[in-house]
Each structure stands twice: as C-alpha cells, then as structure tokens.
C-alpha cells in the first residue's frame, strides 16, 4: 500500500493521482487491516428539517453548517420529503431551491421556525481548536463558529463567504482571494475582538501545521513548502505558500496546478485564526508552540476561542447540551434561517430515546433503529413520516489491531479486562500479522446481520459500503494510463474511481467486490450490497493462513484456537447485539 500511495503522491496530473490512489486503496483493502462497514445515512429517519437546505457535498466540513437549514414545527411527511427531493434535483444549481422549499412547506400547512434542535450527539467535543483536530466530533461543532473563504450551499454550489472573489494565475500556481470588509471576530460574549483580515488565514495555517492535528496531510504537496515546514526541513513560515498581501488580499502559492483547490477550502485546515487572540491565550508559533505550557489555554473550552461565524457558544454542559446562539456581529446575520442551534446529548443506553425525543420535539429529527422502527409502526407514525435517509461520503470501518498492547480500559484498568493469557496474546498477535488470517476475518463477518441490529433486515444493505472511498466519489477528467501488475491499462475520461480500485483487486486475485457497475440502477456503486462476506472465500483464506502459520511454528486447530477480543459499549443495546 505505502509504495502505491507514494507513487500516487508523485503524480503530475489530478486524474493520474486519482487513478494511482485507487490502486493504493485496493492494496490497503487487500491487506485486511480495515474493513469498510457502512456510510452515514441509508436508514429510516423522521425529521422537521427540509432536505437539501444545508450542504450535501461529499467532502469537507460544510455539511455540518446549519445556519441555512429550513426547519418546521411539525414533522415533515415522507411524501413531502420525496416531493422536495425531486424539486431539488430540478432546481439544483439555480439558487432557487431554498426559497421554493420555504414556500412549499408553508403552502402544505407547515410552520417555519428559527431554532434547530440537532439530532442527539453522543460524545462531547475534545477540543474547541478547529485547527488542532481531525476528529469529526470536534469539527461538527466548531464549524458553526467560524466562516471560511468559500462555502458550499444546499445546491452544491461554492458561494463566497469571507472571500468576496478570487482569481487564479495563468499558470495555475497562484490563487488570490479578496476578503470582504466588515467581518469581525468576537469573543464568546459577543464582544468585538478584531476585524477579520488576510493575516488570520496565515496565522491559522501556521498554527494548523504546528499543531499537526491529523489533517495537515491534505495540504502537503499542494501548498508550496507545506510538507517541508511540517517535517521541520523549513522553519521559516514566510517560505510557505500562504501570504497576506495586505489586510484584505490573501495569496496561496501552489507547488503544481491543482484544479480542485477551491473545493478543499471547506476543510478545517483552511480555517482562519486571529493571531492576537491566540497569543493572548498563551499560543505561540513554530518551535515555540507548546500546547502543554501552563499558560496555554487556547481551545481548551468554548470561551477560549474567537468567533467569526454565524454562532457563538452560549452554553456547553458536558454530556447534556451545547447551545449555539446567533452571532449578532456576523457579516451575514440577516440571511441565516436558524438563530438558536441546540445539540442534545444521548448516550445510546435507551434504544428508543431519540425517537421519543423527536416525536416530543426535544430534537427535530432522528434516524430510526430497529426498536424505534417498531415503536413508530406501533403508534402510527412510520407510514406518514419515515423516509430513507440519503447516504454520503462518510465511511465507518472496523479496524483489526495487529499490534495490540493494551488489555484493559486505558482509563480504568479494572474495566474491559481481557481474559487472554500472555501466551494467548502472543499467539493472537502472531496470527494477526498474517494477511490471509485478516482477510478470513473480514470475509467471514456477515455485515448485513451486523448492520441489521441498528436498521433492521429491510435496510441492512441500504447503507452498506464496500470501499473506504465511495467508488463514485470522483471520475477521471482526462484519459490516464497506469500500470496494473505489469500491464498498462488505459482509462478514458469519465471512468469512475471505483472501477480502477476493482480492476486492481481483480488483478491481484482477491475475492472481494468493491465496485459493481450494475449497482444503483446501472449507474455503478460501492454501496447497497455485500461484496466481502463469503463463507467459502473466508475458509479458503483461513486455510492458507493456518498452513503458513504452522510453517512459522504456530499451530491453529480445535485444541489450539486463536482468541479474539471485541471491545464494545455494553450500555448500548445495538452494540451489544452486534
């Protein structure tokens, strides 16, 4: 995998990079270290939120911005959801859908409101520093507190945010953004801190590279000297390709033309940060950066960040609620639909709590698990309000620990204590180093039965995903020729990413299907079927593993089994059943 990935990293064109990354992904799946399980969506849901009234794109953080959500006081009927989805497809790209959705809902007798009680969250943010994290639990909350340069709307169109306009140099190496004047930073009490300027994006990027929260790789090889600064080869940040030409002109210099550069701006690695506020919280840059310093408080709580987005956090009660209130100083305050955004906590111990809260209006929607589907059918709400949620690019995977060194809960060693002896652990570790053993496990898991514990048998394949990256995530922009196991293969423009992944897997003789060109009514898909689970293939892989491990001195048979531990949250009925 790593050799294939490095080759992709050196690609000269975007399409070549996509094709080589597809080959690398095939190698990673063949390794059996990570098993793709499901996407987000594909389950029954009920909601008061009109579909497609916030970003739906398959990348970045904009999908978690809710200021333009259209929310009603009543649950929206499934038939109306279907009508609105069809109308969205008709109006996509015109900029007219949101206004139409509001008008349609009012014509159908719904009442619009300016509050949104977000579907139950299950984990507190671990930091409020958007530039020092790669965790979705953090970004999903913090993204509502700042604006980026540009932002996707509900129709999938990039719209100006803090940047009013931009231009690209003829050689494609320089992007120049012109920032709007009048945007401000405020503290958690709404008091002005400073004006938003181009330097905020310079400071933000340097802090992101200093913190190395896990997403810095996104700009490596893209922005000039980003890789070198992150590795320490370059220590003078002025040599990195991000510059404030003046207070309202921001310039990015790229190592090579990148046609998708503006589509990356929704990722939190491009978030701004006010330099003086950061320094007032003990923050430093470069070699002096030390998040463990006694006086470093930036991002430790919601009071220790500055805000330039549609909301400020007015209340954060751990494992209870997070309340976002409209930022009165927000540059676009007159054009947001939601003035109070409230996140409600749910630990998952009560399988029907989310459904009951949605019916009662405590939250404005929820996905339905098997228990809540039964409840909805029993009380008559299912037929009227339940619809199948759309899937997105999120992929949830299962991970095999091939180098385990922890045998109890790291935070409380009296919990989740493994029954393995030292000999058991050594045998399991040796077995897990064998690729055929790992493949046997991956091919032996009935993912349909696994997912059915949450969504029921009728939807168990609806959200099932067979690859890490959805096969239809991108298509080649131009013809590309790549080497697949010594044979040159040419792919025309328009070829799906997933097709290249599957071709490499087939060439390697690994019996999994991660791209089916006949799926999704002939459009092709990586979703909606189980391309991994096969008892015969699993047994074939295990037989080879047993033979190879025996040659290495490890006997596996009925009297000498390999013991596997699965750690799960026993408070959750779904996790327990899985």
Task: List each model region and its residues.
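Local pocket/hinge segments that shape ligand/substrate recognition
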Residues: 1, 31-50, 371-538
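Ligand/substrate-recognition segments at binding pockets and active sites
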Residues: 1, 14, 39-42, 90-91, ...
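Detector for C-terminal structural segments
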Residues: 1-119, 124, 137-141, 442-506, ...
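Short, well-ordered beta-strand elements
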Residues: 112-123, 174-178, 201-204, 250-251, ...
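N-terminal lobe/hinge region of extracytoplasmic solute-binding protein
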Residues: 119-170, 306
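Gly/Pro-rich hinge or "lid" segments in bacterial periplasmic/extracellular proteins
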Residues: 133-136, 140-143, 153-157, 235-239, ...
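Aromatic- and charge-enriched surface segment that lines or borders ligand/interaction sites
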Residues: 164-219, 245, 251, 357, ...
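Ligand-site clamp/hinge motif
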Residues: 298-302, 329-379, 392
């Amino acid at each position: 995998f790593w050799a294939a990935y490095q080759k992709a990293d050196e690609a000269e064109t975007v399409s070549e990079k996509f094709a080589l990354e597809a080959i690398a992904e095939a190698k990673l799946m063949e390794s059996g270290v990570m098993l793709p399980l499901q996407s987000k969506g594909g389950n029954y849901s009920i909601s008061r939120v009109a579909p497609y009234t916030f970003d739906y794109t398959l990348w970045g953080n904009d999908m978690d911005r809710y200021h333009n959500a259209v929310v009603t006081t009543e649950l929206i009927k499934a038939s109306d959801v279907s009508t609105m989805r069809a109308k969205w497809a008709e109006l996509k790209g015109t900029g007219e859908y949101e206004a139409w959705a509001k008008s349609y809902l009012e014509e159908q007798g719904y009442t619009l409101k300016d509050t949104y009680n977000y579907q139950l969250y299950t984990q507190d943010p671990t930091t409020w520093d958007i530039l020092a994290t790669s965790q979705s639990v953090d970004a999903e909350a913090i993204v509502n507190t700042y604006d980026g340069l540009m932002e996707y709307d509900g129709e999938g169109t990039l719209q100006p945010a803090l940047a009013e306009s931009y231009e690209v140099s003829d050689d494609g190496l320089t992007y120049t953004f012109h920032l709007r004047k009048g945007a401000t930073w405020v503290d958690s009490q709404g008091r002005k801190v400073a004006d938003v300027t181009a330097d905020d994006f310079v400071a933000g990027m340097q802090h992101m590279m200093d913190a190395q929260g896990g997403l810095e790789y996104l700009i490596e090889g893209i922005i000039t000297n980003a890789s070198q600064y992150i590795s320490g080869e370059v220590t003078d940040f002025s040599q990195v390709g991000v510059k404030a030409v003046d207070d309202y002109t921001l310039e990015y210099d790229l190592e090579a033309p990148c046609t998708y550069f503006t589509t990356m701006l929704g990722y939190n690695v491009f978030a701004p940060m006010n330099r003086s506020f950061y320094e007032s919280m003990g923050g430093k840059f470069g070699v002096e950066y030390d998040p463990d310093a006694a006086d470093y408080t930036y991002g430790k709580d919601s009071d220790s960040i500055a805000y330039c987005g549609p909301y400020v956090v007015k209340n954060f009660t751990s494992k209870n609620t997070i309340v976002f209130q409209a930022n009165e100083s927000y540059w676009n305050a007159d054009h947001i639909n939601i003035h109070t955004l409230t996140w409600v906590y749910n630990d998952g111990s009560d399988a029907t709590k989310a459904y009951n809260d949605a019916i009662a209006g405590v939250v404005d929607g929820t996905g339905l698990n098997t228990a809540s589907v039964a409840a909805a059918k029993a009380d008559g709400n299912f037929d009227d309000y339940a619809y199948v949620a759309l899937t997105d690019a999120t992929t949830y995977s299962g991970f095999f620990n091939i180098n385990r060194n922890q045998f109890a809960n790291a935070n409380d060693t009296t919990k989740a204590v493994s029954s393995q002896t030292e000999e058991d652990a050594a045998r399991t570790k040796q077995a897990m180093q064998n690729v055929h053993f790992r493949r046997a496990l991956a091919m032996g898991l009935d993912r349909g039965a696994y997912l059915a514990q949450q969504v029921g048998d009728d939807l168990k394949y609806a959200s099932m995903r067979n690859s890490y990256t959805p096969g239809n995530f991108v298509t080649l922009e131009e013809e590309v020729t790549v080497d697949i196991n010594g044979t040159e293969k040419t792919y025309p423009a328009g070829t799906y990413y997933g097709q290249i992944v599957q071709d490499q897997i087939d060439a390697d003789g690994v019996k999994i299907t991660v791209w089916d060109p006949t799926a999704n009514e002939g459009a092709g898909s990586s979703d909606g079927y189980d391309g991994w689970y096969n008892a015969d293939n699993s047994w074939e892989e295990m037989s080879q593993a047993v033979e190879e491990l025996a040659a290495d001195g490890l006997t596996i048979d009925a009297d000498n089994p390999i013991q596997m531990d699965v750690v799960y949250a026993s408070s959750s009925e779904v996790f327990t059943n899985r």
